[in-house]
Amino acid sequence: MADGEDIQPLVCDNGTGMVKAGFAGDDAPRAVFPSIVGRPRHTGVMVGMGQKDAYVGDEAQSKRGILTLKYPIEHGIVNNWDDMEKIWHHTFYNELRVAPEEHPVLLTEAPLNPKANREKMTQIMFETFNTPAMYVAIQAVLSLYASGRTTGIVLDSGDGVSHTVPIYEGYALPHAILRLDLAGRDLTDHLMKILTERGYSFTTTAEREIVRDMKEKLSYIALDFEQELETSKTSSSVEKSFELPDGQVITIGAERFRCPEVLFQPSMIGMENPGIHETTYNSIMKCDVDIRKDLYGNIVLSGGTTMFGGIGDRMSKEITALAPSSMKIKVVAPPERKYSVWIGGSILASLSTFQQMWIAKAEYDESGPSIVHRKCF
């Protein structure tokens, strides 16, 4: 890699819902598309269409009528490697239009990703895509870097899973990481259910996308849920209208904050788990007493499901109620947090000090996939 001064590393953040990919040193990902692979339900139906055996991302989304859709990543963890390979292939060749054998690749992984998975990612990069070098970084750690910190606790909540990850001087503390299987997809489902109770019918995958759009545009988190609920009964101040693709306009009021309230009260959808505030607190309590102060003072939100208005203030209020009374609590919600994992990767892969951290192809050839545990931690 000594001569590779002019070669930009690629950064690929594979989420349950969306793939974020681009070039190290950029301030935002070039390509953002759904993590979906679609295969034709009936082969040879579309005569003369030059039908592909698989479609990825937006194309799969738009042709979903004739396809069977699969999500190769569930709850942040890859569970279907053939489809994952298709997604990476699409990322390199169709979205970024690069030859992966010419660029180092930084991939991201969920916290507590199984060891076998890291090895499989490493193997595919070197053997299928022939990358000259690669690295695997934990998503939450990258978000923390993107916020300009090396110590703090990250609440990373995406489409398929949420994690609370305490990080001290750049290293995640695995014994204190907690996973919550409650994230964006569950909120969309909950909003679909609330709207169905009101007499609107949203059931198909296409309609789910409409509800997701509604959730993203109109939902917010109440500072005081009960009080907001009372206000919404007597006043129309929380009402907003939303135009559906067919031109029909629906008005939603209390649904706007009832939907994401589930993050703080999972019991609303029948889950027994503690909410995101309590999970964050529990994570901090699993850490050494000497570093808790640094964690309470650096609570960083990351991921698309933390994009709701009001989330920072509410989180601050809830954690203040749980923490020791003298503790200084700071919740940081960076405006670009939807992409902060990717941005952190872009920063890391461009650092001159990081250049000796890459796993080189020669090292892989010598040691095999297990090299990833020695070089990426």
Curated annotation (Swiss-Prot):
Task: Report where it is expressed, by tissue.
Answer: Little or no reproductive-gene expression is detected in vegetative organs, such as root, stems, leaves, sepals and petals.
- Name of this chain's protein: Actin-4
Query: Where in this protein does the record say N-acetylalanine is found?
Result: 2
Tell me which EC number(s) this protein carries.
3.6.4.-
Principal subcellular localisation of the protein = cytoplasm
Q: Which PANTHER family match?
A: ACTIN (PTHR11937)
Where it sits in the cell: the answer is: Cytoplasm, Cytoskeleton
What is annotated about its quaternary structure and interactions?
Polymerization of globular actin (G-actin) leads to a structural filament (F-actin) in the form of a two-stranded helix. The binding of profilin to monomeric G-actin cause the sequestration of actin into profilactin complexes, and prevents the polymerization.
What Pfam family is a match for this entry?
A: Actin
Name the gene behind this protein.
ACT4
According to its UniProt entry, the function of this protein is described as: Actins are highly conserved proteins that are involved in various types of cell motility and are ubiquitously expressed in all eukaryotic cells. Essential component of cell cytoskeleton; plays an important role in cytoplasmic streaming, cell shape determination, cell division, organelle movement and extension growth. This is considered as one of the reproductive actins.
Extract one GO molecular function annotation from the record.
Answer: hydrolase activity
More info: There are 8 actin genes in A.thaliana.
InterPro entries from the UniProt entry: Actin (IPR004000), Actin/actin-like_CS (IPR020902), Actin_CS (IPR004001), ATPase_NBD (IPR043129)
Keyword Ribonucleoprotein found:
no
Question: What are the GO cellular component annotations?
Answer: cytoskeleton; mitochondrion; plastid
Which keywords describe this protein according to UniProt?
Acetylation, ATP-binding, Cytoplasm, Cytoskeleton, Hydrolase, Nucleotide-binding
**Catalyzed reactions per annotation:** ATP + H2O = ADP + phosphate + H(+)
Its family remark reads: Belongs to the actin family.
